[in-house]
Amino acid sequence: MPRLTDATKAARRAQIIEAAISCFLEKGYTNTSMSDIIKASGLSSGSIYSHFSGKEDILITAINKRLNNVKELYETLPEGAGPQDILETIHTNQLVNDNFSAMLRIRAKSLHAPEIARATADTMPLLQGIIVKTLTPWAAEQLSVLHEINPNSAQRTPEQEALIADYARDTADAFMMVFQGYMLRSFFGTPKEKDRLYRVASALLPE
C-alpha cells in the first residue's frame, strides 16, 4: 500500500474533522459515537484511528485549527490596528462567524461534557494572547499621546513598557467581552439585525 503524502494526510484529517463537527452539531458531542464519525466521513475505522485517538482528540484538533484561523486573520491586520478595526475584520469574515456559531452550538448541546471543558480550557487565554499582541502597537500609540510614553521602544522605561502591556491586556479583555456579547446576541437574533448590532458593539470600543 503506497504511503500517503503530507497533502493527502492533511486532507484526510480535515475530512475527518468536518465529519465530526457535523455529527457534533446534529447530535451533540456527548451523543456522538466514533461509529457516527466514521460513517459520516466515508473512511474506514483504521483510517480514522491512524489520524486521531478518539473523538476528544478530534475536538481538540478542531478547536486548535479554528484558533489558528483566527490567528492568521489577526496577522493580516496592519500594525497599529485598534479594537474597532479588529471587530470590523471579524464582522466581515464569514469563516470566523461560522466557526463561532458552530462551537457555540456544540457547547450548548453538551454543557456538562468534561471533554468539552478540557478541550476549551486554554481557548480564552490563547485568544487573549493573540488579541493582546495585536493591540500592543495600538496601545503604545495611544499612551504616547495620553501619558507621553516614548514611541521609540528602545528608549522606554520598564514602567512605560508595563503600562503599555497592562493597557493592551485590559483593552483585549474589554474587546473580548464586547465581541462575545455581540456574537451571542447575533446568534440568537435575525440576519437583518446583525449590521445594527455590529454598529452598537463598535460604538462601545475605542478607535
List PLM regions with ranges.
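Hydrophobic/aromatic-rich alpha-helical bundle segments in the mid-to-C-terminal region
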Residues: A117-A121, Q142-E207
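Helix-turn-helix
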Residues: Q15, A19-D57, T61
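Amphipathic alpha-helical segments used for helix-helix packing
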Residues: V96-A121
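Hydrophobic alpha-helical connector segments
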Residues: T61, E72-F100, E148-E161, T171-A172
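Residues in soluble alpha-helical coiled-coils and helical-bundle/repeat scaffolds
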Residues: K39, S53-D57, T61, P78, ...
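Short, basic, alpha-helical segments at the C-terminal edge of helix-turn-helix-like DNA-binding modules
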Residues: N64-N69
